[in-house]
């Protein structure tokens, strides 16, 4: 089975070349200096990797999946795909800044799973999103065991987790017991096999659908998120993805979403995040000085929720007048504090809890930065990420 059961296996994997080191440098991108407690993305900052040209493109309010090979995504490299033979992990990292007055600050490494571009910022009602299930791969079914086997891997089906909502299509006739235009939920058997359930609860319980024949033609599974596919641990951020600042307004910002238990009609809690007026490029809109409506970088979830499977509505309560923003679905990998100018912050993730964060194939890795004090524009950050797989 992929993964590491001992330190000896980690050492063996590294000796066998099953590792990757990436050096990076990114510039702080906003057109105005940050104030303390603000968070910004480094997506569009110059450096290595270069600035993205993705997050202010595409159709309004439509989900767009992001992978490390997505055109113009400009993500951190992590060694390419290794599944299902191996599992990849982030083993260690360091980061540093030599830019004056930047430290102390905090860097957060995140996997951006996908995003919704919002250009209709003058609309003040909750706007419905489009969530087309665009990830797809083919499968065959065994009527004797009810087990389905992946027969293509273009969209990395080894990433699919138990409880993921899917739909099916076919060029012929689906296996008996299954239908098109119907929601099913995955029971993951292995990285190459799965079963299907009629509900999320049945998927978690392992109660599969009885398949009584293999059907005819080519069968296809479609799903939404390319990683963390059931939404567990997935969070959201609102950020200015454009070079132009947003307009002069301070709207409440809220989401309607489906949670990772596949429960619909979930909502941002009552004390809503408040967007900054004239928010500059790369700003996570509701971060900044303390007070009502100011939060850490993720949007708060409804009580009891553990993640977002899809966003169904997006709302700014008053007109943002001009500009645009994006809402991204992200999974935090780790954080590293930078306490002192010129002194690297280091993380040995083998010995932390939880240790060895998993890096899924296709991961779109980026940095966010949380300012501890006023941060000048074009401030540089640099460092190194170390990955190992086995």
Model regions and ranges:
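C-terminal interaction-tip segments
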Residues: 2-35, 323-390
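Short, hydrophobic/proline-enriched secondary-structure or compact coil segments at domain edges
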Residues: 40-43, 90-93, 234-239, 308-319, ...
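Autoprocessing Asn-cyclization modules and mimics
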Residues: 2-180, 187-194, 200-203, 222-252, ...
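Extended low-complexity, serine/threonine- and proline-enriched intrinsically disordered segments
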Residues: 251-263, 382-387
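Small/polar beta-strand repeat architecture
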Residues: 132-224, 246-248, 257-356
């Amino acid at each position: 089975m992929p993964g590491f059961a001992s330190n000896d296996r980690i050492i063996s994997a590294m000796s066998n070349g099953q590792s990757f080191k990436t050096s990076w440098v990114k510039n702080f991108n906003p057109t105005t200096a940050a104030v303390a407690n603000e968070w910004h993305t480094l997506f569009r900052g110059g450096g290595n990797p270069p600035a993205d040209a993705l997050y202010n493109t595409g159709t309004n309010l439509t989900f767009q999946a992001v992978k490390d090979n997505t055109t113009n995504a400009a993500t951190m490299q992590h060694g390419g795909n290794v599944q299902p033979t191996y599992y990849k992990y982030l083993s260690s990292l360091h980061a540093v800044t030599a830019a004056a007055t930047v430290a102390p600050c905090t860097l957060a490494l995140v996997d951006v799973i996908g995003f919704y571009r919002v250009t209709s910022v003058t609309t003040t009602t909750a706007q419905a999103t489009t969530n087309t299930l665009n990830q797809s791969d083919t499968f065959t079914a065994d009527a004797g065991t009810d087990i389905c086997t992946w027969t293509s891997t273009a969209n990395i089906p080894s990433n699919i987790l138990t409880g993921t909502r899917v739909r099916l299509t076919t060029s012929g006739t689906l296996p008996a017991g299954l239908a098109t235009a119907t929601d099913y939920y995955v029971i993951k058997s292995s990285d190459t096999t799965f079963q299907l359930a009629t509900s999320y609860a049945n998927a978690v319980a392992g109660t599969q659908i009885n398949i009584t024949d293999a059907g005819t033609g080519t069968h296809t599974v479609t799903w939404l998120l390319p990683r963390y596919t059931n939404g567990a641990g997935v969070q959201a951020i609102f950020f200015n993805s454009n070079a132009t600042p947003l307009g002069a307004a301070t709207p409440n910002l809220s989401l309607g979403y489906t949670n990772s238990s596949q429960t619909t009609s979930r909502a941002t809690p009552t004390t809503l995040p408040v967007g900054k007026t004239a928010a500059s490029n790369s700003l996570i809109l509701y971060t900044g000085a303390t007070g009502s409506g100011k939060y850490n970088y993720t949007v708060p979830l409804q009580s009891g929720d553990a993640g977002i499977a899809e966003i169904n509505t997006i709302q700014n309560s008053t007109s943002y007048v001009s500009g645009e923003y994006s809402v991204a679905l992200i999974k935090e990998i780790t954080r590293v504090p930078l306490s002192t100018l010129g002194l690297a912050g280091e993380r040995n993730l083998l010995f932390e809890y939880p240790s060895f964060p998993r890096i899924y194939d296709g991961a779109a890795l980026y940095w966010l930065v949380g300012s501890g004090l006023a941060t000048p524009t074009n401030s540089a950050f640099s460092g190194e990420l170390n990955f190992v797989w086995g």
